[in-house]
UniProtKB/Swiss-Prot annotation:
Keyword Disulfide bond tagged: yes
Organism: Fowlpox virus (strain NVSL)
Protein name, UniProt field: Probable FAD-linked sulfhydryl oxidase FPV093
SUPFAM superfamilies: FAD-dependent thiol oxidase
Highest rank taxon of the organism: Viruses
Length: 94
């Protein structure tokens, strides 16, 4: 399934979850992991889960580390470079 059709919706959900659960990090991580496991593209799912594991996201207790990890992941995968998030303009959540 082509992520150009559903990808932006998943990214919106990911960033909503991070901001909504910034004070409940365990719930946040659980939701993020489940979303990545449910990605309709097998390659995207594998890539996301490998990146989560490689960067120790599930063992992190720092919401900003998780937030900036997902921003970086998004920027590395975005189809249109104009849609990249300028990391210099992003403020920490807490």
């Amino acid at each position: 399934m082509d992520p150009r059709y559903w990808g932006s919706s998943f990214w919106i959900v990911i960033f909503i979850i991070i901001t909504k659960f910034k004070h409940d990090i365990e719930t946040c991580k659980r939701h993020l992991y489940n979303i990545c496991k449910a990605l309709p593209c097998a390659e995207c799912k594998d890539h996301a889960l490998q990146a989560i594991q490689k960067n120790n996201i599930m063992s992190s207790n720092d919401i900003n580390y998780i937030y900036f990890f997902f921003i970086s992941l998004y920027n590395n995968l975005v189809f249109n470079p104009e849609r990249c998030i300028d990391i210099k303009k992003v403020k920490k959540l807490i």
